[in-house]
């Protein structure tokens, strides 16, 4: 013979109903969060594109000025930004990978 089914107490039943109802009610919030993420990604893409254009203009202008002096090399250093350096002092800015 099988075990008789346990009946839930009123408190346990109320907790189960509350748990299930909150799961159902939270779903639209998840959907809203997904839409919000898409908006943020689109906004970030615009700012990244704008920053990339500014960076491109900066690099092009620096490269144009480098053509005048062929003994110097243009490098990017995180401490100083873009730096013109002689080929002899290039190792000062290089890093090991």
From Swiss-Prot:
Top-rank taxon: Bacteria
InterPro entries: LtuB
Pfam assignment, any one: LtuB
Listed name of the protein: Late transcription unit B protein
Organism for this UniProt entry: Chlamydia pneumoniae (Chlamydophila pneumoniae)
